[in-house]
Amino acid sequence: MKKINLILILLIFSCSKNDTLVSQDNTQNIDPSPNGLNLIWSDEFDVDGTPSSTKWVFETVPPNNGSWWNNEEQYYTDRRENSIVENGVLKIIAKKENYEQKSYTSARMTTQDLFDFKFGEVHIKAKLPAGQGTWPALWMLGKNHATAGWPQCGEIDIMEHGDGNPGLVSSSVHLANSDGNHYYLRGEQIIENESSDFHIYKLKWSSSKMEFFVNDKRHHVFNVNNTMPFDQPFFLIFNVAMGGDFTNGNIDPNFLSATMEVDYVRVYQ
């Protein structure tokens, strides 16, 4: 898939408003390097098997008395049944099964302590899981979250899906106000074929603002100032949760499994 895109690029050179509908076209698969920026980190998922241990770590220990936050219902594992690279694509697989006193399993992968960065662009080409109750997310946390706590460390949600509308994807920025209380701002887009086609989810992050895109259609801009925690390094997180507050707690009773596929993730500065 990525090799075909490169060939297409070589051939070429040799010859916000919410609920904006993003249509599917052939150009969405071509993702050249942004002008003036250099690729500083990527995973093309070209080696089949377990995701690279030099780039990813698995979070498997629930932090909230045996559960994850937001009333989620999954147990995250590092098993190949829940995360694997096959045919050049990372697959994070949510499954209905009894495991460690939970009814669902999935995976949560991060680059914590392996890679973090401040400012630049993140490009992620992904196909989202289908099914009511799945909550896929491509997002980031501040490197200092262990000491500063959340939301003081800041959170950048490049893409979330599962808010009850099959085509709705959203991007959010979470932080604390002057009283230490959590608040967030969100932008949304309606896209077609989110679970059958790959789309490119993009963050542009500078010292003054963050911009969020799907297939180069911008749907959210967040202005940054020096009182906010977005002038420090952040690390990446990929996961598929089940149920939880974001999905209104509704899981299809006939759900068996669903997969988020990631063709690549690239970070530029």
List each model region and its residues:
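Sec-dependent signal peptide recognition
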Residues: 2-8
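GH16 jelly-roll
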Residues: 19-269
